[in-house]
Amino acid sequence: MTEHNVRNFNINFGPQHPAAHGVLRLVLELDGEIVERVDPHIGLLHRGTEKLIETKTYLQAVPYFDRLDYVAPMNQEHAYALAVEKLLGIEIPIRGQLIRVLYSEIGRILSHLLNVTTQAMDVGALTPPLWGFEEREKLMVFYERASGSRMHAAYVRPGGVHQDLPEQLVQDIGDWCDPFLKALDDIDNLLTGNRIFKQRNVDIGVVSLEDCWAWGFSGVMVRGSGAAWDLRRSQPYECYSDLEFDIPIGKNGDNYDRYLIRMIEMRQSVRIMKQCVNRLLSDAKTGPFSSIDGKVVPPKRGEMKRSMEALIHHFKLYTEGYHVPAGEVYAAVEAPKGEFGVYLVSDGSNKPYRCKIRAPGYAHLQAMDFMCRGHQLADVAAVLGSLDIVFGEVDR
């Protein structure tokens, strides 16, 4: 009897793989079709964001946040703006808060639509992405009408938002809500009961709640395993405490539960958007949309044409920028992918001394090895799809 040396088979998944969602490289160790080890290689989209922010004024740092999770840009700006406002100790008027929340929920729908439909595409369903992108296109137009840009908005700034929303735009967002729910029903009918979709996702990538906390998960990943942890509820910011919405939680902690939670969250986001639209058209129809602290928010164009002081002030704010009191602060928002946090250290100058970005996708990608071990090779793509990973924020 001869002895055979059996060694496992190594393959590279990515960086140009269509299911890799960007520039991920996974080194997979396979025993036949069973995955023995998953080794994610990241850093292929590293741009040194945290270091670059240290060389810019507080206002100039805002656009860097759009480029992290680039499928829901305003949610990141929101966390940064909250951190700077905490250090400055300024309050945002209610109209500004409502606009921020409205656009944060639009970002959540943008992200979940992309994720749910591409997760379906990863397991072979080709129709949902076409339907999802049709709705995303309409939302991108709302982004553009608010900020002038479809993706990199730089709209949520420390002190409020950049410009007020026209009344017509608010009405159009309100009109978009109900037809969208019908489109969501179509995707729901196609996927939720689909036998093939369920076979590829049920009991795949199961994570228990204890493991979730141990791996540092947040957002949908934790809620899929049964914890009702949502920063909009547990640590309310802006005007979330005044709004009505439900937090869906799963019980199995598998890919399918996470898919269902994202579907329900989109409906809850529409519910929040409707409440914001109603208030923006009634009690918060007029009034300031950004802080009235003139030391942070630049003066209006009309004022600059009348007053020399306003012109000087505007020039100073855009060249030197405002000085933020020394201190350190952590602000987090419930981004579509999980808890997006900004840890900001100020030394009292006009530039951040250090800005640490806590990206949710980074913690989730760490657990790829833990979640895929023992599964089939084909399940790696399904697990990766349900983690909802965008490389801008993982590599920063």
Curated annotation (Swiss-Prot):
Keyword Cell membrane: yes
Membrane-protein topology: Peripheral membrane protein
Localization of this protein: Cell inner membrane
Signal peptide: none
Keywords in alphabetical order: Cell inner membrane, Cell membrane, Membrane, NAD, Quinone, Translocase, Transport, Ubiquinone
GO cellular component, one term: plasma membrane
Enzyme Commission identifier(s): 7.1.1.-
Highest taxon in the source lineage: Bacteria
PROSITE patterns: COMPLEX1_49K
Enzymatic reactions: a quinone + NADH + 5 H(+)(in) = a quinol + NAD(+) + 4 H(+)(out)
Major site of localization recorded for this protein: membrane
Keyword Cell membrane included in the entry's annotation: yes
Recorded GO MF terms: NAD binding; NADH:ubiquinone reductase (non-electrogenic) activity; quinone binding
Record's subunit section: NDH-1 is composed of 14 different subunits. Subunits NuoB, C, D, E, F, and G constitute the peripheral sector of the complex.
Similarity comment: family membership: Belongs to the complex I 49 kDa subunit family.
Stored PANTHER family: NADH DEHYDROGENASE [UBIQUINONE] IRON-SULFUR PROTEIN 2, MITOCHONDRIAL (PTHR11993:SF10), NADH-UBIQUINONE OXIDOREDUCTASE 49 KDA SUBUNIT (PTHR11993)
Role of this protein: NDH-1 shuttles electrons from NADH, via FMN and iron-sulfur (Fe-S) centers, to quinones in the respiratory chain. The immediate electron acceptor for the enzyme in this species is believed to be ubiquinone. Couples the redox reaction to proton translocation (for every two electrons transferred, four hydrogen ions are translocated across the cytoplasmic membrane), and thus conserves the redox energy in a proton gradient.
HAMAP family for the chain: NDH1_NuoD
Protein name, per record: NADH-quinone oxidoreductase subunit D
Taxonomic lineage from the root: Bacteria, Pseudomonadati, Pseudomonadota, Alphaproteobacteria, Hyphomicrobiales
Gene name for this UniProt entry: nuoD
